[in-house]
Amino acid sequence: MERAEQWINSQAVRLASLDPGAPHEDLRPLRDRLRDARVVALGASSRGTHELAAVAHRLLRFLVAELGFRSLLLEGDDAASAELDAYVRTGRGDPREVLTGARPFLRTEEVLDAVRWIRSRNERHPGDQVRFALADPDVEPGQELAGIERGLAENTIRWHERTGHKIVYWGGLAHLVNGAARTVSPGALTHRNAGSYLRERFGAGYVPVGLTFHEGHEVPASPADFAEAVLAAGPAAYVLDLHADAPADVRAWLDAPTRTRLIGPDYDPADDASYHLSGGSLAEWLDLVVHVRDVGAARLLR
């Protein structure tokens, strides 16, 4: 893996800060890569870390300010998204109360910070507002996981068709990789996911970005056969284009079947290696990776 580690260090775009309010200079090398995207998907390997949520918020600000994205699809709670959309457009309602009643992975100060930033921005630009993407009432929510994946993709497609907005989709890695036959473990559940439907619809206009990490609070270092074990050789926080020019042996590593972390609410650190995504390669699943070496827990709403 030495050659892959050397390539990562040569290609990595170092992040100067994870602070959502930091200047965008270090992100500007991404402009050309993301300029033509219709949907940029920020898929986190865990939705319970401060750093991955902060960098997702930072990328949201960049995409809105620099590349004209005007909708945020916050995966996981359609009712909460509808209330948050009303808040960011009109100021009606209490976003803290909405998120406190939402699904557990949305009950964080980091998500609330992003909501409040959108409202603040919309107040400054009342004629050019950022929206929360809303579920289409004609899309039947699936009961089985395969149906849920189709529904996630269909709602995204219909919102884009309805509004014409470029969309930042903030959700989970398992849903957003381009995974026609990816497997979620434990349980070894294999089915086509939302990201593969979105790639089919938008082609290169769908850009999946993996938000990954090596270790952190109550999470041991990545197993040696996980992609993160190699990604950890890069800077403390960076962006990597998985389709940049690479030597043949590095390209073989990028194209080889791999595993990545996948940490949900039932995660058990004593059985860390069991919680992973498999059934594809980094280069198949993702266009970009944002890797943070060390993470801590998100700040829960009180």
Regions found by a protein language model. Name each.
Residues 1-302:
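Structured catalytic-domain cores with a bias toward divalent-metal coordination
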